[in-house]
Amino acid sequence: MICAYNEARTLPDLLEALGQTDVLVVDDGSSDGTGRLAEMEGAIVLTHWRRMGKAASLQDAIDYALDNGYGTVVEMGADSVPGKGSIEKLITSMDSPAVGGASVRQIPVGRKSTSYYIDELIWSVLAQGKLLQMVRHGTSHLGGVMYAFKPECVSSVEGSVNDDEHLSVCIKRKGYKSVFVPNAVVYFDASSSIGHILQRRRRMYFGHMVYPDSTAPSMEIGIAASALLRSLAEKPSRLPWMLPAVLLDLFSRMCAWRDARSPKKIGEYAMWVTTFEKNVASSAARSHR
């Protein structure tokens, strides 16, 4: 399942990579022909005639899966491409009745720049954090660009400001595990700028903070610190990017902490998208109303 808003440029690569897999696209009020393109590529399309946000789109996708008897679904971003065999590995990891969700290793791709190297370090730390969670707790955070879950394990996601955090918490509360599958990978667009990294991290931390029982490894200081050290040991060339990555992450956390105390920010986060340019355009449109 793919929740898409103006993704006509990136969607074809993903649909081609998915091949004959059953694909559901929720077109969330796109104006660039995303829905038509998805239908032409053979996907099932649900259409919102106005933009309703990621949570509403994901809820429609979950309802469709339940109504049509899908026991396990994979949710992914429109700008992502799964590694060969990774979807199959995700599905296989869900065979145990004790498992309600599963996530993969995320690898950003893009032009080698300052923002790319910082981004690459941040995502490698997340992967190491999930590995540590599996060792210490036998379960891990679900969130990411691509993950699988059993729809029956999830209560309504409508109104949530961070959908994958919401799913992860739902699965945990219902007594299921979320597993990390490190040999399954997904490639996705790296952050386009320092501002884009800040937006992404700020949104993620906001989502973690509004859920007191967040499962995110970044909210466990011991795991986060150990994950950073493991990531640097895995690839020492990441060391020059450690300080800017840590400072950027701390600033993102402080911004999110402030946002979490502002009720009017919740509506803005509900409509948030991960593409920096789209958020800039949306903010500009709101300021001119």
Task: Say what each PLM segment does.
Residues 17, 27-35, 50, 80-81:
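A conserved acidic beta->alpha catalytic loop
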Residues 9-13, 32-40:
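Acidic helix N-cap motif at the loop->helix transition within catalytic regions
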Residues 56-57, 93-149, 153, 202-205:
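Long helical/loop segments within the catalytic core of UDP-sugar-dependent glycosyltransferases
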Residues 35-64:
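Conserved donor nucleotide-binding strand/loop of the catalytic core
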Residues 6-20:
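Short, well-formed alpha-helical segments that are part of the catalytic scaffolds
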Residues 94, 103, 107-122, 158-222:
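Catalytic donor/gating beta->alpha subdomain of glycosyltransferases that bind UDP-sugars
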Residues 70-79:
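Short beta-strand-to-loop acidic/aromatic patch adjacent to the donor-nucleotide binding site
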Residues 206-289:
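Terminal low-complexity segments of carbohydrate-biosynthetic enzymes
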